[in-house]
Each structure stands twice: as structure tokens, then as C-alpha cells.
From Swiss-Prot:
Cross-referenced NCBIfam families: PRK13607.1
One GO CC annotation: cytosol
Signal peptide: none
Free-text function comment from the UniProt entry: Splits dipeptides with a prolyl residue in the C-terminal position.
Disulfide bonds: none
PROSITE patterns named among the record's database cross-references: PROLINE_PEPTIDASE
Lineage, uppermost ranks: Bacteria, Pseudomonadati, Pseudomonadota, Gammaproteobacteria, Alteromonadales
Necessary cofactors: Mn(2+)
Residues the entry annotates as binding Mn(2+) 2: 248, 259, 423
Assigned protein family: Belongs to the peptidase M24B family. Bacterial-type prolidase subfamily.
Substrates-to-products reaction catalysed: Xaa-L-Pro dipeptide + H2O = an L-alpha-amino acid + L-proline
EC number: 3.4.13.9
InterPro entries on file: Creatin/AminoP/Spt16_N, Creatinase/aminopeptidase-like, PepQ_N, Pept_M24, Peptidase_M24B_aminopep-P_CS, X-Pro_dipept-like, X_Pro_dipept
Protein's name according to its UniProt entry: Xaa-Pro dipeptidase
Amino acid sequence: MTTLNAKLASQYPAHIAQLQQMTKSVLSRENLEGLVIHSGQEVKAFLDDNCYPFKVNPHFKYWLPLIDIPNSWLVVNGEDKPTLIYYQPVDFWHKVTPLAESYWGEFFNIKILTKASEVDKLLPYDKKGFAYIGSHIEVATALGFEAINPEPLLNYVHYHRGYKSKYEHECLRQSNALAVKAHQAARNAFLQGDSEYDIQQAYLKSIGYGTNDTPYGNIVALNKNCSILHYMSLDKMTPQVHQSFLIDAGANFNGYSADITRTYSYKNDKFAELIARMDQLMLNAVAGLKPGVSYVDLHIETHRAIGQVLRDFNFINVDADTAVESGIISTFFPHGLGHHLGLQVHDVGGFMADERGTHVNTPAEHPFLRTSRVIETNQVFTIEPGLYFIDSLLADLKASANADQVNWQNVDEMRCFGGIRIEDNIIVHQSHNENMTRDLGLS
């Protein structure tokens, strides 16, 4: 057993015990006997026999690191050893993944399913007391489930998913280690003058990934394309001049996601100075992640800090407080500061005040925040402030009553660079923050 597997093996029992206790509590509360969690199944494109890439149910991979096996099931009740119904068909068309020995296998009663259509033989006979958790409602209905994705139950689980176990922390460190290695390869490709497409290939090759292995579609943008927040076009043509490079790209380990962003300037110029300033601003925001602090308040503080950057670089003609009051900062920073991170890139539970799912509203002037929850120990966040020169938003500002608050000549000079986003992945501990991304060597 490798050192990493030994560490995971030592941490996994406590993780399973935590899930068992959580399941027992929510089943008692909702007067249910158990949960039947479906890994999912392949979905065919319309009028086609080809399937979309399979993406496992996050509630399934919460229990065990099986992320590419459709038609599998978990039956859990919080007390007995969970049952894993593992799909292993006899199939000469496709590769079948046998169930290998692992550190987690002993925690499950394992049953092999050879035909997906015969799963009912292995599921509880009387399903009245069981809730189906998964996306295939038609399958659940056909099998006779009455309780399908009950909202109170999901609220409870989603709220508690905000707190990560030590096992989950280690999985997130490993996904960050992969992403850091790939980011370094991508940076080198940019500096040698590659195209967006070739940079993407360098990223994937460095960690042995295919296109569908990343937890989300990589954003690999050069020059003005850096102003498009979710740019995914991957131009194969090399630009005549390399000016800027923004990469927002992650990796996956055991179903847990890394989500890292970096921005680079090709030259040591004013844009490079702006990147350095935004990098320090990002680290200041990381330092503000403390138990008991509202993430909304941290976003608002960072929002004002970006206003100060705009003033210091003479992009605006007013002080930061005036820029906050007038609302012009949102033109340059139009998204939220970050989000919870875990089994999903934008992990669940970010807007919940309690395990009942009580919603915590975001301020009307900050509609794109992805979390409004109070920060607590063992939570994991991204911190990703940005500063962009987006033509459509700048046009709206220029046509507004606040146009005279902007130094348009200086702003126009930056349009060719697109924008800046810098994003790290952080574990909040009781006495300190663990910046996984920086600790693993990505500056």
C-alpha cells in the first residue's frame, strides 16, 4: 500500500462513521428506513445511440470513490453496513471495470449486478420506507419508490456537506496537487508562445487527462479573450502577439474537485503590475476567511478593496468609497468572491443558515455571490477576486450617469489584456487557513 493509500485508509473510517451518523439522524427526522442512492446511468443524445460523458451522482461518490461506474447503487440506513450494488456486466462491446481491492471495500456489503434492468432483485422489496436519491426520476418511479429526492432530507445532507472530514481534506489536497502540476505546464506553454488549444493540450498531458476528465470545462484564454468569464472556445490559431493569459482549470481526485485560476502577463508591464496587486488583494481576502465571519461581509470588503486598486491605477477618478456607493465597481468585478468546494466545483449548502435549509439571501447589489453562509471550521472555499475590462459592461457604464467617474483613456489601454482572475483553494481550520494551492507550489 502506498503512503497516500495508507493515509486515506486511516482517514476513511471516520468519514464513513460521520456519514452513517448523519444518515441515521436524518432518517429518524424524516421517518424513513433508509436511502437508496443511484450512481446514475448513461444518457443517450437525442435520436442517437451515443451517450453523453457519464457524470456520477455526487451523493453516491460522497460515500466511496467510484466516479465512473453507472448503474450502481448504495443502500444505507445509518446503522447496518451499507450495501453496494456494483454494476459489472458481461459486455464484449465496452471495457468493464472489475471491482478491485481497496481501503474502502471492507465497509460495504458488495453485491454484483450484471444486468442493469435486474437491479430490483437486489434492492429492498418494500420501498415505502426508502427514499431514492438520484437524477433518474423515471427509473425511481418504475421501481416503485414514492419518496424521491425529498427536499428536507437533501437540505440536511447539503448543509452538512459544508463541513469536510479529514478524508475529504486529503482528497482535496490531492486534486490541488494535480491541478498545480497542470497549471505549471500551461504557464510554460504560454511563455513559449503556444495557442489556446495547445496550452490546453499541455495542461491535460501533464497529468494524463482526457478532455472529459476535468471537473469542469477548462477556461484557457489569451489576450482580449480573458475578459470573457466562461470562455471555452480554445482557438487553435496562435495570436500574432501574446499579451495576457488567464487559465481557470481544475483536477479531480476520488471525486473531489480543485478549482484554480491564474493570470499572467507576457511582458513586465503595467498589466503585470496590476496582476501583482490583485494577487496581494487575493491573499488578503484569504486571510479574512475566519470562523464566525460572514462570507458576504468578506466579499463586500474585497469589493471595496478592488475599488482602491481601480483608484490607485487611475482607472477611476473617485475614491473607493464613492465607487462603492455609485456601484461602478461591479463593472470591473461582476462576480462573487468565491464558493464552497468539494464533491462539486460549486459545492452545495452555500446559502443555508441551518440543516433545515433556511435560505440566507445575498445583498441585492451583489446578485452573483455563490455563498452567503457564515464561515466555519472545516469548510473549504475558493477565493477568486477579479478585475476585468469587458466591452459590454464598459459600454453600459459609459452610457450611464456615472461615466465621468472613469478615466476612459487608461481603461481603454487595458482592453486588449481582457482581465485578471486569481483563485486559490482554502481549508478553514480553527487556528489558521490552509491554502492548498500555494502550499503545493503555485505562486
